[in-house]
């Protein structure tokens, strides 16, 4: 979507309802929320003693870690492509 038009949708993350607004499609926002929900549940299985705030922060740290690793991999591939030219 990303045409500047705002889309509003309600999602469920870890048993809580959130209304989110973005420029992406509702399907995309639900997909992203589903990933967050899955990650929170995955971390909770390994750390059931965490309160919701610590679980949310640990989830954010894990997701950003994954993002940084993918970003580094992308940059490495871009460098390799430039070296071939």
Curated annotation (Swiss-Prot):
Disulfide bonds: none annotated. Activator of cell division through the inhibition of FtsZ GTPase activity, therefore promoting FtsZ assembly into bundles of protofilaments necessary for the formation of the division Z ring. It is recruited early at mid-cell but it is not essential for cell division. It comes from Bacillus subtilis (strain 168). Residues 58-85 form a coiled coil. The keyword Protein biosynthesis does not apply. The lineage of its organism: Bacteria, Bacillati, Bacillota, Bacilli, Bacillales. GO terms for biological process: division septum assembly; FtsZ-dependent cytokinesis; septin ring assembly. Keywords: Cell cycle, Cell division, Coiled coil, Cytoplasm, Septation. This is Cell division protein ZapA. Pfam families: ZapA. GO terms for cellular component: cell division site; cell septum; cytosol; plasma membrane.
